[in-house]
C-alpha cells in the first residue's frame, strides 16, 4: 500500500490474490495523499482529500492477457500473450537501465517506475509461464540498480509474487531437487510404493497419465480428506484430518512461516497427516520416525535438517506453553451458553476434548491475555466490535501487536543475490487459424475447494471460454452460446470440448481464455493452440439469479406442524398461486 508506482505483469490479482488487489487500490491513492500533504490537509479527512485529488492517481501499469477488475484505476493497460508479456517486462528492464525501446508503452512504463520513490512490481504463476516471473525479477533488479546508483535517495524497489496455493512457497523450499510429476511418471517402474499426501493428482495429470500411473504396478497409498477419482485405484486410503482439525506451518508469499492450529477436535477415526505418516513409518520399521510423539518434534527436526528452516522452532511456543499456568481458550465468553445447544437431547454438558498438541483449549476456560501474538485465537474486548477491538491487542493504535510479530521470516529482502538477464527469446510459434489458450482464474471456481460447497459453487457459475468481440463476430456467437475447442498436441490424444462463450472487451491478440481450475477445463493446457468453431447443439443456460428464497420455502414447508392455522392456509394459497416464481432479492 506504500507503493507510488506499480507494474503488474501477467496477473489478475483480483482473482488470484484479492487482498493484494485491495492493497493496490489503496496504493494508487498515494498521489492524493501527497497532494493533501502539500495542501496542508490531514489524510484522515477523506472527503477533502478525494475532492482535492479528483481523478489524479499514482501510476499503475497492467500488462495482462485479458481485462481485469483493476483496469478502472490503471493509468495504462496493455493486452499481450504470455510470451509477449515476458518480452514486455524484459524491455522495461532494459529501458530502466538506459536502453529505450521502440515501443512507446514500454518507455512510459519505465519512466513511471524510474520517477517513483517506492516502485512495486507484481507478478505470479497464474499464467504458468516462468519467463513472466523472470521478467518481473529483471525489472526489480534494474530498479534496485537505479536506486542504489542514486546515493541521494534512500528508497527501495519492491517485488511481490502471487502464489497459487497457501503453502506453495513452503513446498518449494522443502524440495531439494526440482522433481516434477512428468519426471515421476517417467520412472514409475523404479518406485515400489508411492505415498500421495493430500494432493488430488486427478487435477494435475491427464487421464492418460493417471492410467499410466495406476497400471505401473506401483503400490499407491493416499492420505486424503476428500474423495477424488484416483482414490478408487489406490491400494490403501487413509482418511486424513482437515486443515481445520490439525496443526502445521505455512510459508506465505512474504516468506514468513506461520503456525496454524485446529479449530475443533478431529472427528471420527481420522488422524492428522503427520500422525498417519508416523504410524506408517513405525509399521515399516523406521524407529527414528516412530518415536515422534508431538508435532513440535517434527518442527524441531525440520529446523535441524536445514539452515533455512532453523527459525521454524521459534515460530510459535510449543505445546507445553501456558499463560499464567493456564491454557489459552479458543472460545470467547459469549460461548457461556453452549450448554443449552443440545439441551433438548441431554442437560449434561459433554466432556470437552483435550488438545495435547497445542497450548490452546477447546473451551472458554483459560486466560486470553499477555500471550504471544501467534497464540491469539480471537480479537474481542468488552464494548468493542470484533474488528475494532484489535487496538486492544496492539502496542498503540495501528501499531504492532503487543505479543510480538506473528511468525518468522525465512526469506529476508536483499539487494544482492542471483540476477535475471533482461534478454528473452519466446519459443511459441503461432499457427494460422489457431488460437493460444491462456488460463483465466476466478476467485470462486478456480480453487479446488471453492466448488466443494454448493453455495460457493453457485457463485462460481459454469466453465467458459472467453473471446474478444472481433472473434465473436467472426464465429457468429454471443454470450451464452457454445464454442467447440479442439486441441491437438504431439504425442497426445486430441482434446475436444465445448464451453459456454464469454465475450471480453480486452483480450490479447490471437488468444482465447478459459476458466482455469473447473472440472471441464482441467484437460486444457496453457499455451496450447486450439481450433475453434461454433457448437450449434449447445443448450443455452437459463438466466441466473443472484439469490432466491426457493429453498427457504421448502424448508419452511417441511418443518411446519401438521395442523395449520388459518393464516398458514392463506399463505399456502398465495404460494400455490405463485408456485415456480421465486422472489428476487
List where the protein language model places each region:
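Glycine-rich oxoanion-binding loops at beta->alpha junctions
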Residues: 1
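Long, well-ordered, tryptophan-enriched scaffold segments
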Residues: 5, 14-124, 128-129
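A cross-kingdom feature strongest in bacterial/archaeal respiratory oxidoreductases
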Residues: 8, 16, 20-69, 136, ...
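Short, charged, low-complexity patches
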Residues: 85, 89, 269-273, 277
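Structural signal for hydrophobic packing residues in well-ordered secondary-structure cores
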Residues: 10, 28-35, 92-96, 100, ...
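Internal, active-site/partner-interface "lid" segment
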Residues: 103, 274, 288-306
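Flexible, glycine/charged-enriched surface loops at secondary-structure junctions
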Residues: 35-39, 149-159, 288-295
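A glycine-rich, hydrophobic/aromatic-adjacent loop/helix-cap motif
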Residues: 119-187
